Amino acid sequence: MYVTHLSLRDFRNYERLDLNLEPGVTLLYGPNAAGKTTVLEAIYFLATTRSPRAGADRELVRFEAQGDLGVPPFARLVCDVVRADGYVRLEVVVQRRAEEESAIGATPTIKTVRIDRKAVRALDLVGNLRVVLFTPADIALVTGAPAERRRYLDVTLSQIDGRYVRTLAHYQKVVQQRNSLLRAWREGRRPLRYADDELAFWDRELAMAGAYLLRERLHAVVDLNALAGPLYCRMSGGDTPLTLAYQSSVAGIDSVTDSRAIEQAFLAHLTRLRDDEIGRGQTLIGPHRDDLLIAVGGVPIGAYGSRGQQRSATLSLKLGEAKLMRIRTGDAPVLLLDDLLSELDAERRSHVQDILERPDQQTIVTATGTDDFDLKFLTRARRWRVESGHLYPA
């Protein structure tokens, strides 16, 4: 799949942008804060309804944007996508609420999502455009907290499988409700004698949803091992592959892929932890507490790898994610690579540029200049110079 046209209005530093895109490699280059990363952010937002860098959606609306006829300012993003199964238009509008509405506790923004001009839920948008985003901050996937690695798996699987994204949303709500009950018992706001009866329903909901998420994550990790490992070898020029191991908080299911068996193990573990969970006021096991162990030659790369190894590992995982999407869906995702070559030595830069040589894969790369790219890459890339929220053919 590929994006043929991107239209932005009052998004970040873009007052207006209409950009035609093609399959293959596109290079956006220019000084920092010119708007290169914003183009990638916009495409990612249209694919997932989430920004990879904004703390709140209201930050996406251009600061100087003015409302019309009493309508508060808004950002509008539209893209046209060609997929293996046809054409689709995606649109997201983020509108600031009027000050008086925000003052009474309403959310600061209203988000409207449309597919082919028909209003839909945000969840329904996910998967219509599949993207893989790599940014310098993504090194946290290797070096950061477990939440970073869980998010990596969730974003990948949510774009592949509509059931996964819906189950994940349901699971998160169940965890919130269950934690609310556990805190109430811990604080003495509910009688403990009813705890088992009240938790029975939520335990079943948690185990059913959690079992599906766990099964799909375990399958994905097996596939990613086979895909990302060789990519790391090619990128690093060595023969020691990257390896992944899923670490579940539910004892004994790290390699079990039968949903019913996972569900039963989940329920049994919840029963054993009942007193501990009430004492701490939170759900102690489940997909929201799991981790993904990343190693090279059996050594955890987050703790002991060099910066170059960590960055190569992160990029290998992202490119492995793209391959997994292609295999599972029959359609290649759009690759969004921000500041791709920074912190890589000359050898790794060369390997990365060779790996990206796929004319049927839309790849959009950003950089501050062109000096780090080889002539072969620059010759086949469509180049745009970005300055102060404007794009110029180069």
UniProtKB/Swiss-Prot annotation:
Q: What is the name of this protein?
A: DNA replication and repair protein RecF
Q: Which PANTHER family match?
A: DNA REPLICATION AND REPAIR PROTEIN RECF
Query: Which coarse location class describes where this protein primarily resides?
Result: cytoplasm
Q: Enumerate the UniProt keywords alphabetically.
A: ATP-binding, Cytoplasm, DNA damage, DNA repair, DNA replication, DNA-binding, Nucleotide-binding, SOS response
Report the protein's function.
Answer: The RecF protein is involved in DNA metabolism; it is required for DNA replication and normal SOS inducibility. RecF binds preferentially to single-stranded, linear DNA. It also seems to bind ATP.
Family, per entry = Belongs to the RecF family.
Instruction: Please tell me whether the keyword Zinc is annotated for this protein.
Output: no
Which GO CC annotations does the UniProt entry carry? cytoplasm
Q: Give the molecular function GO annotations.
A: ATP binding; single-stranded DNA binding
- Residues bound to ATP are 30-37
* Localization, UniProt: Cytoplasm
From the UniProt record, give one GO term of the biological process aspect.
DNA synthesis involved in DNA repair
